[in-house]
Amino acid sequence: MKIYTKYGDEGFTRLYGGKRVSKTHVRVKAYGKMDEVCSLLGVIVAEIRENDKLNRVLGEICKECENIQQQLFDCGSDLATPDRLREYKQKIDDVRWLEQRMDEYIPLLPKLEYFIIPG
């Protein structure tokens, strides 16, 4: 598999199926952001896995993070596929699984009274 194509050298890229779009297209921006989140999850998982004590306590969360990473890759792939040129990988059960995880973890957080500023 080639990791570069040279199609993006002029500010354009190709979606699945060959459709050419600007690198500023909303689809491209969206799967770029998904890649960023996926990378951050990867760093978190790697840090936890390197620490035996943390890994024993948070190993199950690592598995969930890895599942979310796969879902992000699938969703990014779907975003790069215009007009359902193939069946989408992301399924409603994936969304339900993520919602269930959120419902499970949200009560463990302090009450949210305002938006959280990242950093």
Residue ranges and their predicted role:
Residues 1-119:
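Phosphate/pyrophosphate-binding loop motifs in nucleotide- or prenyl diphosphate-using proteins
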